[in-house]
């Protein structure tokens, strides 16, 4: 018995000695790290290694504007006081942005950061435009985004300023679209990508601003692309061989957008609700888009007044005179800041020409048009004028005014 036990112990010891070197050798062999790849073929730089990736991009817009405002006087001192100003010529760099995007640590973890070196808004002159953490499960059609990014309301607003058909967005944008805010969104599509949905909650305080009231901003959006996915790009410079149609509706409520809640009111602040209906159609040589908005502002705190109702729309269409190269377009937009006030609308009409070398990444756009104020515009309340083009100091009141503007913009993006 004792001999058998000794034999078993001896055999076990020999086995351990035999296995130990193999284990030690195996432990010393670490898996080779994934190959690191660098691609700069599209202007920007993309570095990737396994599930980790980083893309560095940038966008710059160089703009020249000539603006002639009817009956406008900007002089505060000197001989020009009381005399209508002539055309004002101005060179500007409205946007100069750097973007970082990619994935980290897990195949479902994505990120996107965007900084604007040009003028920005927000606390402490924040330069942050986007700061997004995205969870996108592999093989799924939904995602979760958190951070600061565009509220999913208004097709033209969520379409990048670098992918517009005109030099800039319509006058409806500032009035009805929340633009960027801090919050969280759950979104997804059907497997065919013909139906999509988004729902989210945001501060409502606007870009790079902390919460200023108790109740947040909520938003929901549903889209239908019956002819295939619609990309967020205006114009036909990127159009495929077949046309695509886009339809959508969005609703929001709660906080007033862009931090317009009355200063000092935190509890039971006035709410704001709005509905947006969106349309776009893109073909190889034709593009059209339109949106209509209806908005109601509650007015009970700090002063009780009837609710303020406003509405507006914009519509534009363009044609490629040279496929993928040269495009002409026209736009019309109108806003009633207070539907209970007659003859107080503000309107916009513009024509545009765009020339594309590398679609929207390298292009020049020129547009000319007028922003007109009806005779009763000056009678609107400050709340009704919020988000509308500011008329400034005028030498006349109670009559229709028209401001003419010519803009040329060169854009480089990669």
Q: Model-predicted segments: where are they?
A:
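Boundary at the C-terminal end of the N-terminal hydrophobic targeting segment
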Residues: 22-29
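Positively charged n-region of N-terminal signal peptides that target proteins for export
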Residues: 1-6
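Outer membrane beta-barrel
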Residues: 38-207, 212-232, 236-243, 308-338, ...
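Outer-membrane beta-barrel pore domains
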Residues: 30-38, 69, 83-85, 135, ...
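Bacterial N-terminal signal peptides
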Residues: 8-20
């Amino acid at each position: 018995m004792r001999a058998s036990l000794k034999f078993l112990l001896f055999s076990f010891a020999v086995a351990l000695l035999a296995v130990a070197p193999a284990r030690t050798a195996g432990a010393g062999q670490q898996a080779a790290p994934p190959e690191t790849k660098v691609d700069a073929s599209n202007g920007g730089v993309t570095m990737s290694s396994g599930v980790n990736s980083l893309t560095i991009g940038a966008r710059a817009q160089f703009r020249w504007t000539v603006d002639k405002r009817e009956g406008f006087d900007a002089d505060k001192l000197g001989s020009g006081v009381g005399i209508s100003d002539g055309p004002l010529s101005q060179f500007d760099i409205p946007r100069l942005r750097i973007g970082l995007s990619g994935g980290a640590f897990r195949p479902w973890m994505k990120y996107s950061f965007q900084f604007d070196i040009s003028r920005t808004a927000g606390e402490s002159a924040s330069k942050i435009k986007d700061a997004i953490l995205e969870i996108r499960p592999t093989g799924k059609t939904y995602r979760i985004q958190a951070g600061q990014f565009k509220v999913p309301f208004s097709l033209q607003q969520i379409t990048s300023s670098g992918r517009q058909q005109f030099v800039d967005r319509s006058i409806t944008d500032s009035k009805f679209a929340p633009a960027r805010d801090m919050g969280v969104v759950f979104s997804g599509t059907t497997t065919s990508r013909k139906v999509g949905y988004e729902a989210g909650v945001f501060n409502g305080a606007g870009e790079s601003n902390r919460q200023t009231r108790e109740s947040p901003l909520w938003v929901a959006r549903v889209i239908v692309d019956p002819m295939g996915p619609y990309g967020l790009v205006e114009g036909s410079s990127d159009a495929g061989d077949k046309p695509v149609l886009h339809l959508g509706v969005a609703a929001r409520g709660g906080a007033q957008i862009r931090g317009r809640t009355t200063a000092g009111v935190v509890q039971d602040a006035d709410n704001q609700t709005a509905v947006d209906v969106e349309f776009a159609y893109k073909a190889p040589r034709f593009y059209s888009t339109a949106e209509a908005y209806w908005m109601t502002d509650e007015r009970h705190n700090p002063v009780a007044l009837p609710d303020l109702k406003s509405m507006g729309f914009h519509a534009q269409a363009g044609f490629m005179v040279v496929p993928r190269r040269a495009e002409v377009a026209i736009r019309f937009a109108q806003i009633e800041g207070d539907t209970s006030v007659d003859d107080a609308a503000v309107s916009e009409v513009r024509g545009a020409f765009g020339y594309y070398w590398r679609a929207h990444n390298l292009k020049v756009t020129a547009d000319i048009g007028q922003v007109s104020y009806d005779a009763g515009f000056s009678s609107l309340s400050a709340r009704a004028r919020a988000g509308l083009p500011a008329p400034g100091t005028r030498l006349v009141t109670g009559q229709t005014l028209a401001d003419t503007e010519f803009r040329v913009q060169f854009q480089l993006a990669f």
